[in-house]
Curated annotation (Swiss-Prot):
Membrane association type: Multi-pass membrane protein
Species in which this protein is naturally found: Petunia sp.
UniProt: chlorophyll a 2 binding residues: H102
Miscellaneous remark of the record: There are at least 16 genes for the major CAB protein which can be classified into at least 5 small multigene families.
Official protein name in the record: Chlorophyll a-b binding protein 13, chloroplastic
Family matches, as SUPFAM superfamilies: Chlorophyll a-b binding protein
Gene name of the encoded protein: CAB13
Family: Belongs to the light-harvesting chlorophyll a/b-binding (LHC) protein family.
Post-translational modification as stated in the protein's UniProt record: Photoregulated by reversible phosphorylation of its threonine residues.
Domains: entry comment: The N-terminus of the protein extends into the stroma where it is involved with adhesion of granal membranes and post-translational modifications; both are believed to mediate the distribution of excitation energy between photosystems I and II.
Binding positions for chlorophyll b 4 per the UniProt entry: Q165, R176
Amino acid sequence: MAAATMALSSSSFAGKAVNVPSSSEITRNGKVTMRKTVTKAKPVSSGSPWYGPDRVKYLGPFSGEAPSYLTGEFPGDYGWDTAGLSADPATFAKNRKLEVIHCRWTMLGALGCVFPELFARNGVKFGEAVWFKAGSQIFKEGGLDYLGNPSLVHAQSILAIWACQVVLMGAVEGYRVAGGPLGEVIDPLYPGGSFDPLGLADDPEAFAELEVKEIKNGRLAMFSMFGFFVQAIVTGKGPLENLADHLADPVNNNAWAFATNFVPGK
């Protein structure tokens, strides 16, 4: 310890910043644990079509002037806010986080609605491939197996499924927000580090474009999920079966045809 103090006080270290580990990084055994942190990305260049005052707007050249509080700083800002939901900075920050998180969940959810049905159509056996019917399998004999494998979590109880989801999803979300074994978190919305093993956010320009792609695809996924819900209520079929029916007979199997079935008096 004395040697280290003398080294730091020597002239060769004068004027230089020295990274000293915090107390949380020093274990009881005297070892230093390096915690992977995330650095914030540099601002995207002014040449990007998705950011800044000259960014792409929601109606292109016919959009008019965007509200003063929509400056094009964040991804997905097309200058449209007729309801004024983003006028308050605190509300805007909250809604922005909610939108990004919902985008991510709905993108996963949309895949979960489509792929089991797609696999079932190609010979892969499922207990129930239609997404809104799959949960009912837990009430049938044999219960519900995670990933269709009885050697994994075998549940005949909603509480067991709920507990698994709380542990698996809650732990990851907790690490994303507050850090933990995966490293210290600087930005909970874009934690990076161990949440970005491929290093997709290393380049600021590429990362800024990926943020735009994420929000655009996430918004489409939210509309898709809304469509899946409506289809399930109206037709009682999964999305791929509805698509196949529409392609086979587009005149009689479309949104307008089903909507007219609910006309009063018909």
